[in-house]
């Protein structure tokens, strides 16, 4: 009986350790940059960014495939360096920020591609439509803040792309932009 209790306790410790192998992080909104660019009538690439970014990361360093990420962007925070254009992008012609205030990405699978790289597949939800998007992600570094040893920060960079038409942004072609939108993401996240 004592052996059974001891075996159960040991098994419980291992199962608990496995369950808590991933560390939890919260994206630091003051150190998060989500940029995008798209063709502008063949002249150049038009650039923009979302200024309000939040999210969480569950990062399992021992088995990155068990990690998860969720990111939310406030559609009304779009910034393209021109207020008139920003207002138009927030309208029903493009992001329809009033009806769909958030753009989200939730990971569904992760494939390790190198020591610090992975392909993260997730559901991008934009204008009420969810479609899979693949991001190429690099884990940059993790360390304590130089002025606060109790605060651990980790950082990631990611790139990817999607077609605006797939999400119902039908007016892109009317304004000579797109069809693809390239993403450039850098986030720092604080360990909870």
Task: Locate each region found by the language model.
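Repetitive helical segments and hydrophobic/amphipathic motifs
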Residues: 11-12
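N-terminal signal peptide c-region/cleavage motif recognized by signal peptidases
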Residues: 16-18
